[in-house]
Amino acid sequence: MDALEDYVWPRATSELILLPVTGLECVGDRLLAGEGPDVLVYSLDFGGHLRMIKRVQNLLGHYLIHGFRIRPEPNGDLDLEAMVAVFGSKGLRVVKISWGQGHFRELWRSGLWNMSDWIWDARWLEGNIALALGHNSVVLYDPVVGCILQEVPCTDRCTLSSACLIGDAWKELTIVAGAVSNQLLVWYPATALADNKPVAPDRRISGHVGIIFSMSYLESKGLLATASEDRSVRIWKVGDLRVPGGRVQNIGHCFGHSARVWQVKLLENYLISAGEDCVCLVWSHEGEILQAFRGHQGRGIRAIAAHERQAWVITGGDDSGIRLWHLVGRGYRGLGVSALCFKSRSRPGTLKAVTLAGSWRLLAVTDTGALYLYDVEVKRWEQLLEDKHFQSYCLLEAAPGPEGFGLCAMANGEGRVKVVPINTPTAAVDRTLFPGKVHSLSWALRGYEELLLLASGPGGVVACLEISAAPSGKAIFVKERCRYLLPPSKQRWHTCSAFLPPGDFLVCSDRRGSVLLFPSRPGLLKDPGVGGKAGAGAGAPGVGSGSSGGGNAFTGLGPVSTLPSLHGKQGVTSVTCHGGYVYTTGRDGAYYQLFVRDSQLQPVLRQKSCRGMNWLAGLRIVPDGSMVILGFHANEFVVWNPRSHEKLHIVNCGGGHRSWAFSDTEAAMAFAYLKDGDVMLYRALGGCTRPHVILREGLHGREITCVKRVGTITLGPEYGVPSFMQPDDLEPGSEGPDLTDIVITCSEDTTVCVLALPTTTGSAHALTAVCNHISSVRAVAVWGIGTPGGPQDPQPGLSAHVVSAGGRAEMHCFSIMVTPDPSTPSRLACHVMHLSSHRLDEYWDRQHNRHRMVKVDPETRYMSLAVCELDQPSLGPLVAAACSDGAVRLFLLQDSGRILQLLAETFHHKRCVLKVHSFTHEVPNQRRRLLLCSAATDGSLAFWDLTTMLDHDSTVLEPPVDPGLPYRLGTPSLTLQAHSCGINSLHTLPTREGHHLVASGSEDGSLHVFVLAVEMLELEEAVGEAGLVPQLRVLEEYSVPCAHAAHVTGLKILSPSIMVSASIDQRLTFWRLGHGEPTFMNSTVFHVPDVADMDCWPVSPEFGHRCALGGQGLEVYNWYD
């Protein structure tokens, strides 16, 4: 070990920050964004690309940027150079920047000036800067000399929550101060008789019943807008505020936000507001809501900016995302809801069903059996036909495809189906399929080659009709191809269907929530044992018995694969096939991604919709390749984009318990429904897309609770595709720019996110997000890291198994596979497959003797996870979980994670367990020992010998038929009182001497480091290696009582000589080990508040180490040894 004086201290530098965006400002065709102390510069020039051109790091030191103020130029030209004042918290810095010819350059930078109070606003005054400070005072500052020229307080020295400075010279400077008394104080600093002489307020404006967070003044119209804690925006007619004694009139009291309003901005024709509800509203000056922009996640939108010449609104949120929206007139506007005025004396009867044949033709049927057509362009109703057989009960469905292929189908309660060509209704064809009621109709289209109509009758029989047209197009042919038989259920009919490319199978769904796979024609079933025929006469055309009395009276083709009750008893609402996957939606609020392998349906991933939208009605793939979800949120029809988390369209229709139809093309989107005896139609140009730009994707809407690095992918320079490489196998000559780290983060927002972190670009790419959890996700563990093709076939990419756990005692296991994809910005794509899940309350409900037991607390949370890989790979790993109910639980993962079973537990700690950590003890010529360490809120550590526990009862590893109660872990091998309060961080590292270095960090800011020896003792009654029992003993023990000023939430032993710790005090500290008590080496201030977890890993000898810190944001550091 080198001497202390010869050691080079690590120098940690920040390379990536993902924090809430707190400041935005448009400067010409550029956008300045403040993220922590960093400034992001985006190019908004339509002649080029919307992209980030520069990140200026650490511009404001350790302060958060809250605003930018641009010095006005005499010629008004800001396209080449700009002088910018950047302020936030108590810091101010002035920079002169140039971005001519697309190149960003910093020409001059002033020093960082620290004010004595919080800066609420800044304004340029003839080369100087006026600052509005937190206790109602104004400072005139000289940015060249760096000194205060004048400071004037107000007589009301109250705390401010916002302020606005108005005027271009000191003599006319006006401040509108938002006091904590919910009043606006208007006063004039230049009226002070002497320096530091207080000035009395000229006017007091009252009206809000909450703190005023933001205000904006429009000089051209004499309007002032304020945003408040009371969830309202007020518009005041104030005239010219630079003139004392003016009259103030409240001309608008705008309610539209469901939470506190953070920001407001007045434009010439609009008022923009944004708040805690993550909604940006566009108002008229009369207080009418014109547009609503939704897409950010989490706790709100923190910054807004506007580009009036381009009619843009830019928003920055707590989720670190930046989005650009088009104002009215620039985007695709919804044409609103219009009544089609069906009621007329010439159209008797009551409307029963409605459907859309494309986006401009609408069909409706009445209880008299009349079928009507409405042309949106002509705006006229036309009766196509009338059939008395379709009175009272009638189903109506239009064929899919461009403008409905000109076909629709009707069905009645007597088993009759009518196929109607819309252009020539006299050529309609009738077929009687069943002796009873037709329960449902659906179309299945395979390109332009094949069109099928499926009709469900009594007894679960589904008739499959093949529809074709004559060469003249004036006649159609309807031929029954075969019949299918659904599995028994209470409501035995299908709900939707779709062809599975290339067309050999049909994917159907039924009312009980099952997804079924049928052959598209009977001849495809070569093996009668697969799927098979249910009873005699299967596939025979004509009328079947179809009685619900059952038996085997009627037969049909059975499904070759079934996923029973996938969406629950509410049923499946849509089936869509795209990109080799099957997507299903249901009324359980979830949509599934399925995969067909060897004629069997396999679930891949279950995703939840937006909060509150439990009735999913459909799924569409838009031209850019992304998907949108259709559904009902209470009484509203919603088109939701899961990628951007945005509600693209909202129609107040009254709910889904009515006849409705949806159609979309690239040109337009239409939604029709019945309400109050009339047909209502909503149309929007541009289909299901919204012309907005995501300048930067958001990460998480709430705090990050865990960060876990999975592996490193090397981007091959000659091929431009990634290849998997373990960090320890990197060649000494490999360069950092080729490396991309794959990191998993989990959050309080119930999502698990997979990120790609390149080593050079200073950016993060969100590859995918998993939304299976119903509560917060607090811990993630990774195992089985490798390549997609396995060791024998090393394909480019990375694969791993992931276990996530959190609130409501819920645990999920899924696999990820990261593969090359040149079409994405990161050149990577991530495929996720959900494998298994487990919840403690569901486990207890399955017990036969549950009436004798106290049910597990449903509020139990998993605080930490650790993977313990056994010597027998066929058995899978163990997952240890630290639980808030005082238990340490062991779960067994089998069948590559598809079986997740509770194996054993212990309540040794008798209080909340915060951390678990597993490690192995390996000695030559001896068996590998598996050890587990747990830490609780009382500061105690417990060590468990898992190998001995499993040896004494080998049947534990065999999944029993009836698992009953879990096994007990017994007593720990060693207990240790390391701290006086809770332990939030824990890590171990083996030493060269065969011992283990153990370090822990506590809530009191202390560190505890000790050397643990594992000695093998042989039992007298045992023979062989099974009789070896380890004895754990502490050799050396050291403590650092005041290592940090707050909770130590991250700790990593990098080597036997160096350790790094992170704390809520926002310090990343390096410690020297190996010379007795740990000694301080170096410390770096990071910018993530309330850091909850940290992970460190070596990248390459040239690039050194990387460290990811997660809390209310994400920050990545790197350093060289």
Curated annotation (Swiss-Prot):
Stretches forming WD repeats: 53-97, 105-143, 147-189, 200-238, 247-285, 289-327, 335-376, 381-422, 425-470, 476-520, 559-598, 604-642, 645-684, 739-785, 848-893, 901-946, 970-1012, 1036-1073, 1079-1121
Gene3D superfamilies: YVTN repeat-like/Quinoprotein amine dehydrogenase
Domain of life assignment: Eukaryota
InterPro entries in alphabetical order: Quinoprotein_ADH-like_sf (IPR011047), tRNA_Anticodon_Mtase-Reg (IPR051973), WD40/YVTN_repeat-like_dom_sf (IPR015943), WD40_repeat_dom_sf (IPR036322), WD40_rpt (IPR001680)
Residues with the N-acetylmethionine modification: 1
Keyword Ribosomal protein: no
GO cellular component: cytoplasm
Any matching Pfam family: WD40
Alphabetical UniProt keywords: Acetylation, Cell cycle, Cytoplasm, Repeat, tRNA processing, WD repeat
Subcellular location: Cytoplasm
MF (Gene Ontology): enzyme regulator activity; tRNA binding
Regions crossing the membrane: none
BP-aspect Gene Ontology terms: wobble position ribose methylation
Subunit structure: Interacts with FTSJ1; the interaction is direct, and required for 2'-O-methylation of position 34 in substrate tRNAs. Interacts with IRS4. Interacts with STK11/LKB1.
Annotated family: Belongs to the WD repeat WDR6 family.
Known function: Together with methyltransferase FTSJ1, methylates the 2'-O-ribose of nucleotides at position 34 of the tRNA anticodon loop of substrate tRNAs. Required for the correct positioning of the substrate tRNA for methylation. Required to suppress amino acid starvation-induced autophagy. Enhances the STK11/LKB1-induced cell growth suppression activity.
Protein name: tRNA (34-2'-O)-methyltransferase regulator WDR6
Naturally occurring in which organism (per UniProt): Pongo abelii
Gene (name only): WDR6
